[in-house]
């Protein structure tokens, strides 16, 4: 996305390759933690969201929070939910994408709910029980419908 491009340009490390579109690495937690909330907001991120990003980057950079495949997802989810500005959808999305947890399922997602038959989040959670422990794959399928 455009916003992700601006974020990567601002905080990602420069990369020299033969490919003209590969010019930066993803931003590291250390680099984002060393930025100010105002500078993060200046690239077009709402200030409250910039504060959330900064707080999470600081926790990851310090080692207090580990976002990696070997973590206990229950512990990580609890830690994520303690960060102001991170709710259940974001926590589930992080464990799905960054930790590769196959049972993550952001049941409050509007597209998932619509594509599953306009279910409420609690109805979708109940319906998704039969997809355990592979609910993230079901989410990917529903997002593509």
Residue ranges and their predicted role:
Residues 1-145:
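HhH-family (HhH-GPD) DNA N-glycosylase catalytic core used in base-excision repair
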């Amino acid at each position: 996305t455009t916003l992700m491009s601006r974020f990567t340009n601002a905080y990602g490390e420069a990369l020299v390759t033969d490919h003209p579109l590969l010019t930066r690495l993803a931003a590291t937690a250390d680099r984002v933690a060393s930025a100010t909330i105002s500078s993060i907001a200046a690239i077009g991120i709402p200030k409250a969201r910039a504060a959330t990003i900064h707080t999470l980057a600081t926790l990851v950079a310090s080692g207090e929070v580990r976002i990696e495949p070997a973590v206990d997802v229950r512990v990580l989810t609890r830690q994520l939910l303690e960060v102001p500005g991170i709710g259940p959808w974001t926590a589930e999305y992080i464990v799905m994408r960054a930790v590769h947890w196959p049972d993550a399922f952001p049941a409050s997602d509007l597209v998932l709910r619509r594509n599953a038959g306009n279910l409420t989040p609690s109805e979708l959670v109940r319906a998704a029980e039969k997809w355990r422990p592979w609910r993230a794959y079901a989410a990917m399928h529903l997002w593509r419908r």
